[in-house]
């Protein structure tokens, strides 16, 4: 492995990076799927937990905290309810991982060619991370929207299958329906991924010397810290994205049937602030951070491990030849 922050930038062939990124996304998604469903349910809940009066007209469930929400879902929908939306999510995570790591590697290598105008290492990591995140988010956004809508379904199913959901959205909402909330997603993910990769590259070298870290390795620990700090800063846009993704003709058919009608990122933010206060923008933050830690640790550890295995396999194959 290369020293310092260069390890993600120039190690491995393009094929190895693509495969390692895809594997990392696949494994990470399956592990954190239950937390993702819980987070989405909490983000779409608009009534106040501290105000019983706001519960009077609620026809759906009232979720209170991560563990109780998980128990409610299992009791009402079965254990499989915690993996709702997992098929589009798995597809999204694999494609996202491939595009993200490939774009990050390509961008950093391109920036390295700017000898005269070379950016500082932290700035290079920020630019490459933001570029990779923006491209990956825009490219996989329809799958992200489908993941959210399936996770928001209760026992009354809005969509019966992945293909039927694609047909229904295309027929009833047009192709623009697949990109509801995309501006919030890109507005969130570009600074998020920039902050994530810059923090990750900065923390990994000093953490690499410690063997007994809580998450097992310097790669994993750096990934956890980078993800948690970046996600906290950008969380309001993530919540707005989820609220916008369930807009349209099926808005009142999901598990929470009282989701308001929102239009645009800024109008959504103003309406949430006016009706729910600043805390309304952070619903689901706790479970999101719980999810961020294992997701980032698993993603970065799986990526690094897969990349090393692929490199070792190539070396072994070349020796046989």
Curated annotation (Swiss-Prot):
Cited function: Mitochondrial transporter that mediates uptake of thiamine pyrophosphate (ThPP) into mitochondria.
Q: Which organism is it from?
A: Aspergillus niger (strain ATCC MYA-4892 / CBS 513.88 / FGSC A1513)
* Family (UniProt): Belongs to the mitochondrial carrier (TC 2.A.29) family.
Protein name as catalogued: Mitochondrial thiamine pyrophosphate carrier 1
Where does this protein reside within or beyond the cell? Mitochondrion inner membrane
Q: Which domain of life is it from?
A: Eukaryota
Q: How does it sit in the membrane?
A: Multi-pass membrane protein
Q: Which UniProt keywords apply?
A: Membrane, Mitochondrion, Mitochondrion inner membrane, Repeat, Transmembrane, Transmembrane helix, Transport
Residues crossing the lipid bilayer are 12-28, 91-107, 126-146, 184-200, 221-237, 284-301
Q: Which GO terms describe its biological process?
A: transmembrane transport
Extent of the Solcar repeats:
12-110, 120-206, 214-309
Recorded GO cellular component terms are:
mitochondrial inner membrane
Among InterPro entries, the record links this protein to: Mit_carrier, Mitochondrial_sb/sol_carrier, Mt_carrier_dom_sf
**Entry keyword Transport:** yes
Main subcellular location: mitochondrion
Q: Does the keyword field hold Transferase?
A: no
């Amino acid at each position: 492995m290369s020293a310092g922050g260069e390890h993600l930038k120039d190690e491995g062939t393009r094929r190895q990076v693509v495969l390692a990124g895809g594997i990392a996304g696949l494994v990470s998604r399956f592990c954190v799927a239950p937390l993702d469903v819980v987070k989405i349910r909490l983000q779409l809940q608009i009534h106040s937990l501290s105000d019983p009066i706001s519960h009077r007209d609620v026809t759906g469930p009232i979720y209170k905290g991560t563990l109780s929400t998980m128990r409610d879902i299992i009791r009402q929908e079965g254990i499989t309810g915690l993996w709702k939306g997992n098929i589009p999510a798995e597809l999204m995570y694999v494609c996202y991982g491939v595009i993200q790591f490939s774009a990050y590697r390509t961008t950093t290598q391109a920036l390295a060619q700017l000898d005269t105008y070379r950016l500082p290492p932290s700035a290079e990591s920020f630019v490459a991370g933001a570029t990779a995140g923006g491209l990956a988010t825009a490219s996989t956004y329809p799958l992200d929207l489908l993941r959210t809508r399936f996770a928001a379904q209760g026992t009354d199913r809005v969509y019966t299958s992945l293909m039927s959901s694609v047909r229904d959205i295309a027929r009833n909402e047009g192709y623009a329906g697949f990109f509801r909330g995309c501006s919030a997603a890109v507005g969130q993910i570009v600074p998020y991924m920039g902050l994530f990769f810059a923090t990750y590259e900065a923390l990994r070298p000093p953490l690499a010397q410690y063997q007994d870290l809580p998450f097992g390795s310097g790669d994993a620990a750096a990934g956890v810290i980078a993800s948690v700090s970046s996600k906290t800063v950008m969380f309001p846009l993530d919540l707005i994205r989820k609220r916008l993704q369930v807009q349209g003709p099926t808005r009142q058919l999901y598990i929470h049937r009282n989701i308001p009608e929102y239009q645009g990122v800024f109008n959504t933010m103003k309406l949430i602030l006016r009706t729910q206060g600043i805390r309304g923008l952070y619903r689901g933050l706790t479970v999101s951070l719980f999810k961020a830690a294992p997701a980032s640790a698993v993603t970065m550890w799986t990526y690094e491990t897969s990349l090393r295995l692929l490199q070792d396999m190539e070396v072994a194959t070349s020796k046989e030849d």
